[in-house]
Amino acid sequence: MADISMPKASAALGETSRAGASIDDAFLALSKVVFADGALDKRTKQLIAVAVAHVTQCPWCIEGHVKGARREGATNEQIMEAIWVAAEMRAGAAYAHANKALAVLDEIDGA
């Protein structure tokens, strides 16, 4: 996962790495294991990561995992389809939470 794009190096980022070097190492080891072939192949895992990166709105994750998905053989169409799945899930959650707003309105209106 060495070629996953990360935020540009800065003094603050360097200090974060120094302050938690063992945590950095553990996270990189976790990433290496998680993104290895397993029950899901690397391409599928990268497509999942593309979708999640869009839901979490992490620009570095989007860049890194789009590159990772392409490296693992994903097509533009597959990458965009993963993004559309993420968009539907995010919109679906907002739609589902409308029930909370309706419950609050019922409380306000005394229903």
Swiss-Prot record:
InterPro entries (UniProt xref): AhpD-like, AhpD_core, CMD-like
Stored Gene3D superfamilies: AhpD-like (1.20.1290.10)
A Gene Ontology molecular function term of the record: peroxiredoxin activity
PANTHER family on file: ALKYL HYDROPEROXIDE REDUCTASE AHPD, BLR3452 PROTEIN
Protein name: Uncharacterized protein 4 in cox locus
Annotated organism of origin: Paracoccus denitrificans
Lineage: Bacteria, Pseudomonadati, Pseudomonadota, Alphaproteobacteria, Rhodobacterales
